[in-house]
Each structure stands twice: as structure tokens, then as C-alpha cells.
Design a protein with these regions (language model features):
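Helix-to-loop junctions at the C-terminal end of transmembrane segments
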Residues: 46-58, 246-258
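Cytoplasmic membrane-interface "Motif A"-like loop-to-helix N-cap segments
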Residues: 56-67, 255-268
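Residue-level signature of mid-helix packing/kink "hotspots" within the transmembrane helices
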Residues: 12, 40-48, 135, 239-243, ...
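C-terminal transmembrane helical hairpin of 12-TM major facilitator-type secondary transporters
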Residues: 259-306
Length: 378
């Protein structure tokens, strides 16, 4: 869990540097979005490969190697910031590529250690690492960036990743797995459209999540007149509440015996909260702040459900690769959302931009294959 928290504090913590980055480098919102997107671009390019490595070599080795590489690349940005923007973007992308090891491997580990009736809760707890990582970044990075500069503030997630790498080597053990001959006889689960639909729905649900997380701090500072530290603390508190919501949705799915029914209902909630934010920005600023708080909770609650469903549908032999594909789709969406939505908001304003973003979770409602959900094979 510490490994995932540290990786998330880096990959998803860069948005908290946006106000300082824009002041230091004179960037537009869309240009700042490229720095936000760089770690997730690196991450999405390697997730499937890390997943295949976890299927082949085990989770412990994959996570230890990836966390070590993350520490080196992010530490290079923090402690010896290159003068070239391209070099900084490259190192951020390499850091994201290395952090992908954690995203691809630790979900598979949880599926191996927990029975089906407890996986929703276990995966929900695992998925709290993302909002907790974002909360850590929100509490620490904005204020630290104002004192040290934007990039040196990344020393914090680099240090967390270093500690996590050591703990993985010392503490973590891979779960038992079926004999390789039995795994090799299993065909691909991608012959059915069910997994593809879950992947697509999950990618659509990333859009509202990143609409709020990538632009929440910026909106409060630029549009509402909040201080940077206060805005970061607000987002951090919301992220902690979002972490609790992921556990709650996991328990919910265990009790109803379905991952996909709760996932679809949360997609409906994401549509509504985006539209409420758009309305608030247009006519009632206080309502927009409320929607930011609620949206930061609702739009992250579904994530663990999708990951659990994907791993259960894929089966033991394919779960690492399937989770890699799942993460890739989500991170394609998370890479594109800050740039595309930033450009749209820059032209139309937040109300129109977030109303357009509501189309994504609306598509997810239809894509989620609730009727095709079956008992897992492992």
C-alpha cells in the first residue's frame, strides 16, 4: 500500500505544482497540462509489459525494480532539475514508466491472497492508495513548491518510493500460483467483449475523476481566489474522503455479489456531479465548491470495482496483463483529460468544459456490462 501511495503521490501529484509552474515558467493552462500528463504517458506505455512480467516472474521482483527506477528518475528532477523542458518531461515520463510496475503488479498480488468474498474490500483498501497519495501531495507539494520551486518539491514522493522499494524487498512475498502448465492451457479472455467493455467504461470514468483532481486546485486559486496552501488542503481532505469511499464501494460490491452494478450506479453519480459543478460555476460559486468536494469522492469510488472485476474475469493466468491493459486504458484517459479539458476550459470556461466532460461517464453507464457479469473462475 505504501508503494502505491508513493507512486500515486508522484504520478498524480504534479497537478498541485501547476500554479507554481505557471508563475515560474509563464505557462498557459494547456502547456502546464503537458507536465501533468508526462508521468501518465510514461506509465501507460509500460503497464502491459509490467503486467506480463508480473505474470511471468512474480509481483515482488517487478515492484522492487520499478520503485527503484522511479526513485532515481524523480530524484533527478527534484535534486538536479535539468534546464531543458524536454529533459524534465522525459524524466517525468521515465518516472511514470517505472511507477507502472506497482500499478500492474500489486493488484494481482491482492487477488492471489484474498478469497472472492473479501476481494472487493481488499481491493478497495488497495485503491485508497491513490487518493491517499494525492492527499499527501496536496498537503505537502503546494506549500513546499512555493518555498523551494516546483520541481524540487518532488523530492517527497521520490523519498516515499525509496522507502517503499526497501520494504517490498524485505517484507513482501508473492502468493502461491497454479502450476505453469495449468496456466499455459488457459486461453485469452479477450475473445469475449466483456473485458473490453469494462476497460472502456473504466476509461470513461477516469475523465470526471481527473476533471476534478487535475483542475480542482487551479480552479479554487484562480476562480475562487483561494490561497494555494488552502486549496491544496481542501483537495487533500476530499481525497481522504475519496479513499474511504473506495473501501465503502468495495464492501458494497462484496455484499451484493457484483462489481459492475455498483460501478454503473456510480457512473450515474459522476454525470450528475459534473453537471452540478457546471451549474455552480455559471450561477452560484458556492455550489461549484460543494460539487468539487462531492465530485472528488464520487468519481474515485468506482476504481477498485473495475480492477476487481477485470482480474476476476481474466483469471489467474491473465490477471497481470489484464490489469496492465486496464491501467493503460485509464491512463490514456488521464493523460488526455488534463490537456484536452484544459484547452477546452481555456476557450469556453469551466461551466461549458465540465458539462462536456459529463458525456464520458454517461457513455460509461451504457458500456458497463452488468447483464454479462458471471461468477469468477478463481
Amino acid at each position: 500500500m505504501l508503494a502505491q501511495t508513493g507512486a500515486c503521490a508522484f504520478v498524480y501529484g504534479v497537478p498541485f505544482l501547476v500554479p507554481t509552474l505557471r508563475d515560474e515558467l509563464g505557462l498557459s493552462l494547456a502547456e502546464a497540462g503537458t507536465y501533468v500528463a508526462a508521468p501518465t504517458v510514461g506509465l501507460l506505455l509500460t503497464l502491459i509489459a509490467w503486467g506480463a512480467a508480473a505474470d511471468r516472474f512474480g509481483e515482488r521482483r517487478v515492484m522492487a525494480l520499478g520503485l527503484g527506477l522511479t526513485t532515481v528518475s524523480v530524484g533527478a528532477v527534484a535534486l538536479a532539475t535539468p534546464g531543458s523542458p524536454a529533459a524534465v518531461l522525459g524524466l517525468l515520463a521515465v518516472g511514470g514508466a517505472a511507477a507502472a510496475s506497482v500499478f500492474a503488479a500489486n493488484g494481482r498480488m491482492i487477488m492471489g491472497w484474498f478469497p472472492r468474498t473479501e476481494r472487493g474490500l481488499a481491493m478497495g483498501i488497495r485503491q485508497t492508495s491513490q487518493p491517499l497519495g494525492v492527499a499527501l501531495a496536496g498537503l505537502v507539494l503546494p506549500g513546499l513548491a512555493q518555498r523551494t520551486g516546483a520541481f524540487p518539491a518532488l523530492v517527497v514522493p521520490a523519498a516515499v518510493c525509496l522507502v517503499a522499494a526497501v520494504l517490498v524487498v524485505v517484507v513482501v512475498r508473492d502468493p502461491a500460483r497454479p502450476p505453469r502448465t495449468a496456466e499455459g492451457a488457459v486461453g485469452t479472455p479477450y475473445r469475449s467483449p466483456v473485458l473490453w467493455r469494462v476497460h472502456a467504461a473504466s476509461a470513461m470514468l477516469v475523465v470526471p475523476q481527473f476533471a476534478f483532481s487535475a483542475f480542482g486546485t487551479e480552479y479554487l486559486v484562480r476562480q475562487q481566489g483561494w490561497g494555494v496552501a488552502g486549496a491544496g488542503a481542501f483537495v487533500a481532505v476530499v481525497q481522504i474522503a475519496g479513499a474511504v469511499s473506495r473501501i465503502g464501494s468495495g464492501v458494497w460490491s462484496d455484499r451484493v455479489g457484483s462489481r459492475l452494478r455498483p460501478m454503473r450506479q456510480l457512473a450515474v453519480g459522476a454525470v450528475l456531479v459534473l453537471l452540478v459543478f457546471a451549474l455552480g460555476d455559471a450561477v452560484a460559486p458556492w455550489l461549484a465548491v460543494v460539487a468539487l468536494a462531492v465530485g472528488g469522492i464520487v468519481t474515485v469510488a468506482d476504481n477498485g470495482l473495475a480492477f476487481t472485476a477485470v482480474a476476476e474475469i481474466a483469471g489467474s493466468a491473465w490477471s497481470g496483463r489484464a490489469l496492465g491493459i486496464q491501467n493503460t486504458g485509464q491512463n490514456v484517459a488521464s493523460s488526455l483529460t488534463p490537456v484536452a479539458l484544459g484547452a477546452l476550459v481555456g476557450v469556453t470556461g469551466y461551466a461549458v468544459g465540465f458539462a462536456v466532460a459529463a458525456v464520458a461517464p454517461l457513455l460509461a453507464v451504457g458500456l458497463t456490462p452488468v447483464r454479462d457479469e458471471q461468477e469468477p473462475s478463481w
